[in-house]
Every structure is written in C-alpha cells, then in structure tokens.
UniProtKB/Swiss-Prot annotation:
It is an enzyme of class 4 (lyase). It catalyses: orotidine 5'-phosphate + H(+) = UMP + CO2. The gene is pyrF. One of its GO terms (molecular function) is orotidine-5'-phosphate decarboxylase activity. Its EC number is 4.1.1.23. Keywords: Decarboxylase, Lyase, Pyrimidine biosynthesis. Belongs to the OMP decarboxylase family. Type 1 subfamily. It comes from Nitratidesulfovibrio vulgaris (strain DSM 19637 / Miyazaki F). Catalyzes the decarboxylation of orotidine 5'-monophosphate (OMP) to uridine 5'-monophosphate (UMP). This is Orotidine 5'-phosphate decarboxylase. It comes from the Bacteria. The active site is at residue 69. Pathway: Pyrimidine metabolism; UMP biosynthesis via de novo pathway; UMP from orotate: step 2/2.
C-alpha cells in the first residue's frame, strides 16, 4: 500500500508542528490503510529550524522525510547524508545529476550514519530525477522529462540508491526497468477537483491525483498545500483522510 507524505513547507517550526499536531487525527486512518503518515521537512523549514524540527516530529510519532536534495562534491555529500541520518530522519535524498561518484559517496554516508545511529530501520536514500515543476520543453536541449527521469533512475539503481523521486508519469516505466522493489516517491499530487485548494496547480506541472499515482505504481505520495492549506482546525486531518481513502480505492 502506498504511503502518504505531508509536505510541511513552512517558514517556522511552530507552524509546522501545529499542522503536524492537527494531523494526528489522520494517523488511525493511515494505519487502517496499511501504511503510515509521513512528514516532509524541506529546505525552507530545515534552514529556519535545524535538526530540532526533525526530533520534534519524531517525538510525535511520525516518520520523517528530510528533503534537502544534496548536490555537491562527493565528500561533502557523503558527510551531509551522514549528518542527515544523525538527525533521526527516516528518508533523505540527493540529486542524481551529481553523478556516479557523488551518489556512491552518498550511499557510503548513509551506511556510516546508520551504523552510528545503531537502532531502528535503515534510512532510505532516494535520488531526485527531474523535478515535477519541470514541464515538457523546459529541459536543456529539449530533452523529454520522462525519458530523462527513466535514464537517471536506472543509473541510481546501479549506483546503490533505494529509489527515486519522480512524477507519477514515470513511475510505471521506472518499475519495469529497475524492479518492483525500487522505490518511487511522487510529488506533484493534487486531489480530484472538489478537494483542491489554493490557486490551480501552483508551481507543479507534471501532476496526478492520488488514485492515478497509486495505479501508476508510486510507493509514496507527497501532498502539501491541499492538506496544509485546508481551512479549519480539523481541515488538514479531514483532507488527509480523503486522500488516504482515494489511495485505498485506487
């Protein structure tokens, strides 16, 4: 069963934790669906709050995806991934275009961090293929986003990563080429029209509904504004429940 990841894209830790507390009411539903409700900490929130926000979310019982998309020289990325694991994060990511040496160094950093942590399940390391904000025709040289994502995913598999970040449009092809156990985490998830909130599809371009992404083979679905922007104190939990129900019905 695919699992739901809530993107806590906030400028402050207080705002992120308030939403996380509001989402506690959806965790029973997630458990009934056979999965867990994850929290995603991205660049804005982590830069503002540091490792404390990961620790606070873990204390609330949520698994955490630390979405920092490392892309630097191999030794720097190795240390960054090792430090990401030390925060207690259950999943982190790097940019696959950083190349083979960088990606293999990241895998080494993951193993070192897991050994130092010494408890719990080994964290998941994902490679970012093509951002879901990229539309066809926007890549250099006119490269096709889906073809480029598939090419990078095959490289990531060879270099030792556990999966990739990709749009739902690429998930089925990546599973065929890399195996069913190769994880596909999919951002750009937007609920069916009656549940949408905010202005259109915002900055996302290659979007799918939760049911479409599950049917395509995505293992983790990332949803932000349709949940975090839901009105009322019970709005985020209700929005998450509806998305989980759509995922179960796929």
């Amino acid at each position: 069963m695919a699992e739901l990841v809530i993107a806590l894209d906030y400028p402050t830790m207080d705002a992120a934790l308030a939403t996380a507390r509001a989402l506690r009411g959806a965790t029973d539903t997630a458990g009934d669906a056979g999965g867990r409700l994850w929290m995603k900490v991205g660049l804005e929130l982590f830069t503002a709050s540091g490792p404390e926000v990961v620790a606070r979310l873990k204390d609330m019982g949520f698994p955490v995806f630390l979405d920092l998309k490392f892309h630097d020289i191999p030794n720097t990325v190795r240390g960054a991934v090792r430090s990401a694991v030390a925060t207690g994060a259950d999943m982190c990511n790097i940019h696959l275009p950083g190349g083979e040496r960088m990606c293999r160094a990241a895998v080494e950093g993951l193993a070192e961090g897991a050994a130092a942590r010494g408890h719990g399940a080994a964290p998941i390391l994902l490679g970012v293929t093509v951002l879901t904000s990229v539309a066809p025709g926007e890549l250099p040289g006119g490269a096709d986003p889906s073809a480029e994502a598939a090419r990078l995913a095959v490289c990531g598999r060879e270099w030792g990563l556990g999966g990739v970040v990709c749009s739902g449009y690429e998930a089925a092809g990546i599973k065929q080429r890399c195996g069913r156990d190769f994880i596909c985490l999919t951002p750009g998830i937007r609920p069916a029209a009656p549940q949408r909130s905010g202005s259109g599809d915002d900055d996302q371009r290659r979007v799918m509904t939760p049911a479409e992404a599950v049917r395509a083979g995505s293992d983790y679905l990332v949803v932000g504004r349709p949940v975090t922007g839901a009105a009322g104190p019970d709005g985020p939990a209700e929005a998450a429940r509806r998305i989980l129900a759509e995922m179960r019905g796929a």
